[in-house]
């Protein structure tokens, strides 16, 4: 606060909020600017939540319903609703009306969405914070519907896609903890099903749940729940790693850990979640957006089976864009794992080469290359190079059969508990396609800035972008021809490791602010059109116990036992 500037008196912001809400027409951005992350006053919570859920002024969806409570599972619905009423401090004369409201909301939702009710869905716990707002039945339904639609992910059940995604996020930030849970066969759905399905209301007290929802609904980001869940795990890490209990007991301890949250913990919970969020690639959201929202939008899910993904995948467009931005944010150190002849024919100009074939063919040279890689990463960050980044992103060819060795290298780094490890989605083929797509006027508009060649064939590579294919027929952007030229076997022997590191640092030391080229996010449909669904991330190499955690790059052990 500037010198001489007086702090607003206590309750001043609450008065401003009340006035803004009273005037009407208040949007979420206005509300957020007034609240600034503080806990909402009880008497204003209902209005703010309705704004955050975008249900202000919505009609009564139940108006045309006949009110018949006649589903086959109606007795189960009634029983669960009655148990909720019994747990709440509700005046006796209001219980019957409230019971009918809750049962009507669930019944109508099941009928209108053609969903079969089951107690394990956790809807009762999701309704509890809303019931405490004492909303009219129409608002209660609209709020419940909005939460289900916007904030509860599709397939939120055992072995569902949301939990495979959470495991990848955990592995990205806390590989040691993830590996430990993997070895115990404690999958995220075994302990976090009710965290995600009830937005923490299953285990947290009413006050704590309200405080969490106050912040979460204002975020207007459904993926933020993943980072709140991550912080719960990170907070319990030491306890988890020290546990010697059996699997079932450990799951119980972990599952109930949100119950330990208190009101004064919520501010730190959100601050830490924001930090981890800022250290996560944007592709985490962009590539999984179909998890949330209308079922019609999610019918065509990503081809990648997240249960088989070795690690988080990052789009090539994000890789190019991320290393141009200044200040804080995710920046990638790209590791090209293709054979030397493919790398020399053409590669991302900022990429470091680590020939994955060496892992089996020459382990000692591979070990030296890994040490050089980590040293190059460290120096590129310190020098302000555009190639510098904390986040390691491995790039293969994009062909599953060719990337098997790269997957082994990836598994090697993950086994060593290296954080911030990802894979370039679609590999070098996807990079070629993206650069061809955004440079519609040919290589002179910027293609050469990103593709480098150490074989003297840059001109032939560039000319193939908008030239004819080898068989004489043009494919528009010459991508097929480009792929052929880039992957031709030159049988060039790999350069000396030391010289490679020096050359890499010298050639990529341009400060970030000297690169004005702005890469746009590609149209999602465009990528899906050109990158085949067979270009998978690759088969996983999991189930390997962690050897040790990296504390110092100089001590990185790369000997393959």
Label every PLM stretch briefly.
Residues 8, 22, 39, 187, ...:
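Beta-strand elements of modular eukaryotic interaction domains
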Residues 1-114, 127, 131-134, 324:
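N-terminal transition regions in large eukaryotic proteins
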Residues 159-163, 167-276, 402-417:
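Alpha-helical bundle/repeat cores within regulatory domains of eukaryotic proteins
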Residues 2-4, 50, 227-333, 339-341:
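C-terminal regulatory/linker segments that are acidic, Ser/Thr- and Pro-rich
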Residues 20, 34, 51, 84, ...:
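Alpha-helical recognition domains of nuclear gene-regulatory proteins
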Residues 68-98, 137-193:
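Alpha-helical cores of eukaryotic small-GTPase signaling modules
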Residues 284, 288-317, 332-333, 337-561:
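Rhodanese-like catalytic fold shared by cysteine-dependent sulfurtransferases
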Residues 8, 12, 16, 26, ...:
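Acidic, Ser/Thr-rich intrinsically disordered and amphipathic helical segments
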């Amino acid at each position: 606060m500037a010198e001489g500037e007086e702090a607003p008196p206590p309750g001043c912001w609450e008065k401003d909020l009340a006035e803004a809400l009273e005037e009407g027409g208040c949007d979420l951005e206005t509300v957020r600017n007034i609240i600034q992350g503080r806990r909402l006053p009880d008497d204003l919570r209902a209005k703010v939540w309705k704004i955050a859920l975008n249900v202000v002024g919505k009609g009564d969806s139940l108006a045309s319903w006949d009110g018949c409570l006649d589903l086959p599972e109606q007795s189960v619905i009634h029983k669960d609703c009655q148990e909720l009423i019994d747990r709440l401090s509700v005046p006796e004369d209001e219980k019957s009306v409230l019971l009918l409201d809750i049962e009507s909301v669930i019944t109508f939702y099941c009928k209108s969405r053609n969903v079969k009710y089951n107690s394990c869905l956790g809807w009762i716990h999701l309704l509890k914070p809303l019931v405490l707002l004492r909303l009219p039945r129409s608002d209660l339904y609209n709020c419940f519907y909005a939460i289900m639609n916007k904030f509860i992910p599709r397939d939120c059940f055992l072995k569902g896609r949301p939990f495979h995604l959470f495991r990848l996020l955990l592995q990205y930030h806390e590989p040691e903890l993830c590996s430990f849970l993997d070895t115990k066969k404690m999958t995220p759905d075994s302990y976090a099903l009710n965290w995600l399905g009830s937005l923490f209301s299953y285990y947290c007290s009413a006050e704590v749940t309200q405080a969490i929802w106050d912040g979460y609904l204002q975020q207007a980001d459904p993926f933020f729940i993943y980072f709140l869940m991550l912080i719960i795990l990170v907070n319990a890490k030491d306890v988890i790693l020290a546990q010697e209990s059996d699997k079932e007991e450990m799951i119980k301890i972990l599952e109930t850990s949100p119950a330990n949250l208190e009101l004064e913990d919520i501010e730190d919970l959100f601050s830490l979640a924001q930090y981890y969020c800022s250290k996560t690639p944007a592709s985490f959201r962009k590539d999984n957006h179909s998890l949330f929202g209308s079922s019609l939008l999610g019918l065509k899910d990503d081809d990648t089976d997240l249960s088989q993904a070795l690690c988080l995948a990052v789009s090539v467009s994000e890789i190019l864009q991320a290393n141009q931005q200044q200040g804080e944010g995710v920046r990638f150190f790209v590791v090209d794992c293709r054979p030397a002849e493919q790398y020399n024919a053409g590669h991302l100009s900022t990429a470091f080469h680590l020939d994955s074939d060496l892992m089996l063919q020459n382990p000692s040279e591979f070990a030296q290359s890994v040490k050089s890689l980590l040293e190059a990463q460290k120096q590129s960050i310190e020098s302000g190079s555009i190639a510098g980044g904390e986040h390691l992103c491995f790039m293969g060819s994009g062909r599953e059969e060719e990337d098997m060795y790269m997957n082994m290298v990836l598994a090697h780094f993950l086994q060593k508990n290296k954080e911030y490890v990802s894979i370039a989605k679609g590999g070098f083929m996807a990079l070629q396609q993206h650069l061809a797509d955004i440079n519609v006027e040919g290589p002179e508009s910027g293609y050469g800035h990103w593709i480098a060649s150490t074989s003297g064939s840059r001109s032939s590579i560039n000319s193939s972008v908008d030239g004819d294919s080898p068989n004489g027929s043009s494919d528009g952007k010459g991508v097929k021809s480009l792929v052929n030229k880039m992957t031709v076997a030159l049988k060039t022997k790999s350069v000396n490791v030391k010289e490679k590191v020096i050359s890499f640092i010298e050639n990529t030391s341009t400060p970030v602010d000297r690169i004005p080229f702005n890469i746009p996010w590609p149209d999602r449909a465009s990528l899906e059109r050109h990158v085949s669904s067979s270009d998978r991330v690759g088969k996983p190499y999991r189930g390997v116990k962690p050897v040790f955690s990296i504390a110092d790059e100089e001590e990185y052990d790369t000997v393959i036992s």
